[in-house]
Design a protein with these regions (language model features):
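Conserved Switch II/interswitch segment of TRAFAC-class P-loop GTPases
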Residues: 113-164, 181, 187-191
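Conserved structured core elements
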Residues: 13, 28-33, 163, 167, ...
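Canonical P-loop GTPase G-domain recognition
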Residues: 168-181, 186-212
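Short, motif-level signal for alpha-helix interfacial/capping segments enriched in acidic residues
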Residues: 71-76, 161-165, 173
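Hydrophobic/aromatic beta-strand patches that form the interior of the parallel beta-sheet core
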Residues: 17, 91-93, 143-147, 181-183, ...
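Conserved catalytic network of the ASCE P-loop NTPase/AAA+ motor domain
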Residues: 81-86, 137-141, 172-176, 202
Length: 212
């Protein structure tokens, strides 16, 4: 039995891919690429395909946080065909991610933004809401995890600012024994320093895969 058959058997064919990690790493961009490559081509109905395309999260460059809450994409699972005639019904789960120094959008006039959430009657800070939502995606809403990390080249935020948040996400996934892969997002994938980071990532996460 290959990995695809194993996943299909364990999940009865329904799979929720939780795309997690720090803010401003490219999580929404990963979801968009995945949807455009593997999901949209498998939707035969033109109207459903257009509606699903409209559900794809926005993404952008820079330091400003784009995602404000967890989101299931698409609204209904879509069957995709993988290797060896294995079929899976897939939904992606986007999240805000853990806040890192240098990111923008979670503060206003030097103070934490307050937001209303379905998890509390009282308003809470954007950062608190982001943490709760991200933990829920990791623990409650995903079958497998895709941890998106970056060398900082995609946002201009220093690489070191991401490390603590990355480690938190990976430690949480390991603590609940949830399978995951690590995706390294970089504007300079061919540079020696990026390849070195990938090797370091792979050596640390020896039981998991690290992709560009």
């Amino acid at each position: 039995m290959n990995i695809y058959e194993d996943i299909a058997k364990r999940t009865q064919g329904d799979i929720y891919i939780g795309v997690v990690g720090p803010v401003r790493t490219g999580k929404s961009t990963f979801i968009r690429k995945f949807m455009e490559t593997l999901v949209l081509p498998n939707i035969d109905n033109e109207f459903k395909r257009d509606r699903t395309r409209d559900e794809i999260p926005q993404s952008g460059s820079g330091k400003t946080i784009m995602t404000v809450e967890p989101k299931f994409v698409p609204a209904d699972g879509v069957v995709i065909e993988l290797k060896d005639a294995v079929s899976l019904k897939v939904r992606m789960v986007d999240c805000v991610g853990y806040i890192v120094d240098g990111a923008l959008g979670h503060e206003e006039n030097g103070k934490q933004r307050l937001v209303s959430t379905p998890w509390s009657k009282d308003a809470m800070t954007f950062e608190e809401a982001a943490e709760i939502g991200t933990k829920k995606v990791i623990r409650d809403h995903s079958t497998i995890g895709v941890v998106v990390i970056t060398d900082g080249s995609v946002t201009g935020i220093e690489r070191g600012n991401y490390i603590e948040a990355e480690e938190r996400v990976i430690d949480e996934l390991k603590s609940i024994q949830k399978p995951f892969v690590v995706v390294l997002n970089s504007m300079t994938p061919k540079e020696e320093k990026t390849e070195l980071l990938r090797k370091v990532c792979r050596s640390v996460e020896e039981n998991h895969l690290c992709y560009f």
